Each structure stands twice: as structure tokens, then as C-alpha cells.
Amino acid sequence: MTNSEKIVYSIFGVTNKSTQDMAYAVDRMAELLFDQNQKLDGIKVGKAIYPVVGERAERPVGGVSRNIQRLTRVCWDAENRKNLIPFLGRDMPIRVPKELLFHLAYYSRTGIPYIKAMKHHAAPPV
């Protein structure tokens, strides 16, 4: 099991394929940020993440996109929200999937929330 799967499952539980889509998307975001050194502003989830996840999951890109968007909204349900805070470092609004993927990808690679790393000046710029 990958770090991203552990993170996603601890937030949402092991429910269905849509959680696997999110785990794949977290892996892809981490790959773009850490392995390919891309800037967050330059990453377009519709072009750089969803198609790769769709190919890996052997599912249509539109379905993958909807699943990830839905799970981003589901994060703010009371039960899931409390499970999300350890990975974000604090309670904060996440409006779009790209933000959530960034925070989860950062945690999956470093083991600490981005916000806490920034407070301690330990976070590398992304």
C-alpha cells in the first residue's frame, strides 16, 4: 500500500473506486511537484493529472474527474473533516481539488503538513 493510499483511506475509509482515483491523483501530484520539480501554478489537473489517473485506473477521464471533485466536497462533511486535519496541519477551506491534492501530496512525500513545514521554514518551495 502506498503512502497516498494510506492517507486517502484514513480520511475516507476504504469505500470504492473513487478513493483509488484520489490516491492515484495524490501520487501524480507528488510526482509532478517532487520528481519533475514543476511549480504548483503550472500544473493543470485537467491535463496533467486526470488523464494519467484515468489511464492508470482504466476508466474515462470524465468519471475520474467527477470522483475527485466529489471527494474534495465530501472532505468537508463533519466525519471526514476531522480525519483531514492531521494532513493539512489545521482546519482550512479547500475549494478545489488542486489544493487538496497539493496538501496530500506534500504530506505523502514529507510526512508533515505543508503549513507546519512553512511555520518552521523547513518546507522546500514548490
Language-model features: where?
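Basic, alpha-helical nucleic-acid-binding regions used in initiation and control of genome expression
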Residues: 3-126
